[in-house]
Regions:
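Ordered, soluble secondary-structure elements with a strong preference for glycine-centered loop motifs
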Residues: 2-5, 48, 52, 67, ...
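His/Glu-based metal-binding/catalytic segments typifying zinc-dependent metallopeptidases
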Residues: 43, 150, 154, 159, ...
Length: 380
């Protein structure tokens, strides 16, 4: 958008000329004591000779935005609606999974409202009712966010370049406006069908495993490999005809299963619900378990480039993930056994009772199974 120094057309050219990109995204990180830290991440990269210009451009695109050009902002909103709708439809498995988690998980509630279906609906409503009052609220939001008192900075560079970049945190002013937490308002939805002009579905189901008495463990990474490769792939992909499927376990307690470009709906949910039965009877020889363990280790210990190292260190800093905790999880992975995997059967029996389902896709298929969903809406 327009800034105090650059107009709407000039700014992208400057960014492309002097940096490797300036991006922003919202995220929510859970700390090891269960608290949620909601942040707006701004990332930028540049060659050493362009560091000063990069700092100026970051300042312009965050703290020096010009909210007086209403028409330019309106065009940005329309462009964002178009791009976000395309992303949500093309990545329906991610969209549905995040939405299902948002029904009960505070962090994913924030994620949905700042980058998912909740955000998309907000943008559509903002475009429909765009006026001076809405513009003033956007300006107020920017002032609340871009405050030096709330800033955490992470830098990755060569040692000789550190002096050039170490004061980047000084670009923001201290504003002392305070915090606004309304964005965390709970979604009053249990299960949902979201209709799109599609012939297939993305089917996701989620639950909070901590409410079933379980805690996060490195063993869950091994369990994910087993379920992805041995159960879901066979039942949902091979036999069911979906293009993809998977599951995941989140530190905060969220667990979910999803399908990608799935011709089925009710059948897929039934497969999710029978995961406990599969685990009760699970067996594997030593070689197979070793392969599952190696796959899990690969997700926690892999080579990272400089940008990835910075992002990883930043997340661990905010979340309070220490080296001791990471080693504990490695040990849990390496000591995983068939018996450990079978012990999670009860967790999936609890998962089977969860009402939190999100299906994105075909209208006829969703309406035919409306007894599984307490809310049915159109994407747009």
């Amino acid at each position: 958008m327009d800034t105090q120094k650059y107009d709407f057309n000039e700014l992208p050219t400057k960014i492309d000329l002097y940096t490797g990109g300036i991006t922003s995204s919202c995220a929510a990180y859970y700390t090891t004591d269960g608290k949620v830290k909601k942040v707006l991440n701004v990332s930028a990269k540049a060659l050493s000779r362009n560091v000063e210009m990069m700092k100026e451009l970051v300042d312009q695109t965050t703290d020096k935005m010009d909210f007086d050009k209403a028409e330019s902002i309106r065009l940005i909103i329309k462009d964002r609606i178009s791009k976000l709708e395309n992303y949500l439809n093309q990545n329906g498995h991610i969209t549905a999974s995040n939405r299902a988690l948002s029904y009960f998980n505070e962090g994913y509630n924030y994620k949905d409202k700042t980058g998912g279906i909740g955000y998309f609906k907000f943008l559509c409503e903002l475009d429909k009712n765009f006026n001076d009052e809405a513009l003033a609220e956007l300006k107020k939001t920017a002032d609340i966010i871009f405050d030096k008192n709330k800033l955490t900075v992470g830098v990755s560079c060569e040692k000789n370049d550190f002096d050039k970049i170490k004061n980047i945190g000084q670009i923001f002013d201290a504003k002392d406006i305070g915090n606004k937490n309304g964005i965390s308002k709970k979604i009053n939805i249990v299960s949902e069908g979201i209709i799109t002009p599609s012939k297939i579905q993305y089917v996701a189901k989620a639950a909070d495993y901590k409410k079933a008495g379980y805690e996060y463990s490195g063993k869950l990474l091994v369990l994910k490999n087993i379920l992805d490769l041995e159960y879901l792939w066979n039942m949902v992909r091979v036999q069911g005809g979906a293009y993809g499927c998977g599951c995941n376990f989140i530190r905060s307690g969220g667990m979910y299963m999803y399908s990608y470009r799935d011709p089925n709906l009710k059948r897929t949910i039934g497969i999710y619900n029978k995961t406990g039965e599969f685990l009760e009877n699970f067996t594997a020889d030593g070689k197979a378990m070793t392969n599952y363990i190696i796959g899990a280790v690969n997700t926690v210990d892999r080579p990272l480039n400089m940008e990835q190292k910075l992002k990883t260190a930043f997340i661990r800093h905010i979340s309070g993930i220490t080296d001791c905790l990471r080693q504990k999880e490695r040990d849990e992975i390496l000591s995983s056994s068939c018996e450990d995997m079978r012990s999670y059967a009860q967790m999936f029996n609890y998962f089977a009772e969860s009402p939190h389902i999100c299906v994105i896709g075909n209208a006829d298929n969703i309406n035919n199974e409306k007894n599984l969903l307490n809310t049915i809406t159109a994407m747009k």
